A protein has these predicted regions:
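Conserved ABC ATPase "signature" region
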Residues: 102, 106, 113-131, 183
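Short coil-to-helix segment of the ABC ATPase nucleotide-binding domain corresponding to the Q-loop/switch region
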Residues: 95-102
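A short, proline-enriched helix->beta-strand linker immediately N-terminal to the Walker B motif
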Residues: 154-158
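The feature captures the beta-strand-to-loop junction immediately N-terminal to the Walker
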Residues: 43-45
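Hydrophobic anchor residue at the start of the ABC signature
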Residues: 149
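Conserved ABC transporter NBD signature motif
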Residues: 66-77
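Helix-to-loop junction immediately C-terminal to a conserved catalytic motif
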Residues: 58
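Conserved ABC ATPase signature
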Residues: 135-139, 143
Length: 272
């Protein structure tokens, strides 16, 4: 039986009109398909449109050309099948960890008496069962990310859109969060589209690694399948010979785009 395609971008183009009337094309002719249960990571230079593609999949941006399909249906408006985990915390500072997780159900009409036990269960699943009554300012960066992850997963989205969710964390905490994410993902294998600047993180987590070119008019220029066995341990998989071979292969392409992006940003700064 064919695995359903959760997200499909066909020749998607994203353009913005600038203040001086010019049109800036961020992404052009993007073709990307994510199967149900597949974990796909997007890597590319700063400003190449990685987050832009994620916003298109979320329905937050409408492409100027091309199409977006979610489970073989044209996307019209917000993607109701997706949960979005941002780089910045989206926690309410005046609410406890428990209330921050429960609110995702409450705003959809779930009675509070039902939402709270479910929120407590999700906090326990991310290792924070004993921290339910703490406020965000009382939690570490990694703990806040766990709350944010539970906040998204409690709504049981079919698709996870993740925009550098572990970017602000230190290297060790990022690896801990990576293992936690894989454990939760292995439980029900949602479709995941994960944006990161970190090629090692992408290879360690994903089934496929997609590379974008430097912008403007960024395109998808490479798509590598990661055949490292699962389940994976983020701490151990980076020592694997296959991991290093794949990293070298992808970096040989990505490095050129990173340098192009750096040169373009330097020229733009000098022109100001």
């Amino acid at each position: 039986m064919t695995t359903p395609t959760a997200v499909a971008l066909e020749d998607a183009k994203v353009a913005f009109r600038l203040g001086d009337g010019r049109v800036y094309t961020a992404v052009e002719k993007a073709h990307l398909a994510v199967a149900q249960g597949e974990f796909v990571a997007i890597v590319g230079p700063t400003g190449c449109g990685k987050s832009t593609l994620l916003n298109v999949a979320a329905g937050l941006l409408k492409p100027a050309a091309g199409s977006v399909r979610i489970f073989d249906r044209p996307l019209a408006g917000l993607n109701r099948d997706a949960g979005y985990l941002f780089q910045a915390d989206a926690l309410f500072p005046w609410k406890t960890a428990l209330d921050n997780v429960a609110i995702g159900l409450e705003i959809r009409g779930t009675p509070r008496a039902e939402a709270l036990p479910r929120a407590q269960k999700w906090l326990a699943s991310v290792g924070l069962g004993a921290f339910a009554n703490r406020y965000p300012h009382m939690l570490s960066g990694g703990q806040r990310k766990r709350v944010a992850l539970a906040q998204v997963l409690i709504r049981d989205p079919k698709i996870l859109l993740m925009d550098e969710p572990f970017g602000p964390l230190d290297a060790q905490t990022r690896q801990v969060m990576g293992n936690l994410l894989l454990d939760l993902w292995n439980a029900d294998r949602k479709a995941v589209l994960f944006v990161t600047h970190d090629l090692e993180e992408a290879i360690a987590l994903a089934d496929r690694v997609v590379i974008m070119s430097a912008g403007p008019s960024s395109r998808i220029i490479g798509d590598w399948r990661v055949t490292l066995p699962r389940p994976r341990d983020i701490f151990e998989v980076r020592l694997d010979k296959e991991f290093h071979a794949l990293h070298r292969e992808i970096w040989s392409v990505l490095k050129d785009e990173v340098m192009k992006g750096y040169a373009q940003s330097t020229q733009a700064a000098e022109a100001v």
